[in-house]
């Protein structure tokens, strides 16, 4: 797909927001904007946010935030899941879930909402990057012993 002159909405967490970038031009959203010669690169990244709703959410979950994004995007990029793994308290759920309170259900809610809101737009889903502790079922240490590994979250994103 030719991206030159297109408008892209980037929905994500701290990686999308650009936390840790030493210069705004080093943020991945701005690198894509420059390299692809986009008309607009809209950054909807918020540090620490998750795809699924959490017990103390306050509307920051991706499955809720997409509703507030600009509607004229040619492409929507969804980059997340690492915080659901690392310190999220929503259960994984099952493929049959359609509630935003489980990881499976939140993905269904998000994807169906995006395809309805952006029927003519391309939607790109980016799976979580490798990270420290990805083989720890407790994520960043706050989850139960029987938690899922990061690769499980990646597999679920691909499955849904």
Model segments located where?
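Substrate-gating cap/lid alpha-helix
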Residues: 131-160
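Short, conserved loop/helix-junction motifs that constitute active-site signature segments
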Residues: 2-3, 70-71, 116-118
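A short helix->loop->beta-strand "cap" motif at the edges of active sites that frequently abuts
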Residues: 38, 118-122
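Generic structural signal for well-ordered alpha-helices
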Residues: 107-111, 154
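Conserved SGNH/GDSL esterase-like catalytic core that processes O-acyl groups on lipids
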Residues: 7-9, 15-105, 151
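Conserved, well-ordered alpha-helix/loop/beta-strand core segments that scaffold catalytic motifs
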Residues: 77-79, 122-125
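Short hydrophobic segments within beta-strands
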Residues: 11-12, 126
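Active-site-proximal loop/turn and secondary-structure-junction residues that shape catalytic pockets
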Residues: 82-84, 129-132
